Amino acid sequence: MKLILREDVENLGKGGDLVDVKPGYGRNFLLPRGLAVTANPKNVKELEHQKAVAAAKAAKLKASAQAVAKRLSETPVTLKRKVGEQDKLYGSVTALDVAEALAARGVQLDRRSIVLDEPIKTVGEFEVPVKLHSEVAGKVKVTVEAEAE
């Protein structure tokens, strides 16, 4: 029996997959629970259409992420902080600080997409990785300078 899965089913497939199962399993388990629909020509055509729409949407998201990555590489960020002995900062520079500085320069990013393993605690230049998409990552150049007293 051929079925189209509506949701992920363990040991069988993911939502949207066309699967071949034993008639009893399909009739008595998958169909009554709404986990699958029969694979008639109408449903198969609808599935193909949904996959095409999803692929187009994914391509659009990836393209916009690549554009943001390019913009990030062209947008250096300079942050001024109070400094103590040996160029150590009072406090630290976090992903939120970098996101706010980028927002001030016209690049809107969620702070969770900025990958800082640990906050920046010294003066200097840093390459901070940014995860924009599952396949696209960018880098932003962050310069931390001593604030004039």
Swiss-Prot record:
Biological process terms from the Gene Ontology for this record are: translation
The UniProt entry, under InterPro entries, shows: Ribosomal_bL9 (IPR000244), Ribosomal_bL9/RNase_H1_N (IPR009027), Ribosomal_bL9_bac/chp (IPR020594), Ribosomal_bL9_C (IPR020069), Ribosomal_bL9_C_sf (IPR036791), Ribosomal_bL9_N (IPR020070), Ribosomal_bL9_N_sf (IPR036935)
An annotated GO cellular component = ribonucleoprotein complex
The cross-references to Pfam families, in alphabetical order and at most eight, read: Ribosomal_L9_C, Ribosomal_L9_N
Q: Does Ribosomal protein count among this protein's keywords?
A: yes
Keywords in alphabetical order, please. Ribonucleoprotein, Ribosomal protein, RNA-binding, rRNA-binding
For this UniProt entry, the molecular function terms from Gene Ontology, in alphabetical order, are:
rRNA binding; structural constituent of ribosome
Q: What family does the Swiss-Prot or TrEMBL record give for this protein?
A: Belongs to the bacterial ribosomal protein bL9 family.
Described purpose of this protein according to its UniProt entry: Binds to the 23S rRNA.
Q: Which PANTHER family match?
A: 50S RIBOSOMAL PROTEIN L9
- Name it: Large ribosomal subunit protein bL9
* Chain's gene name: rplI
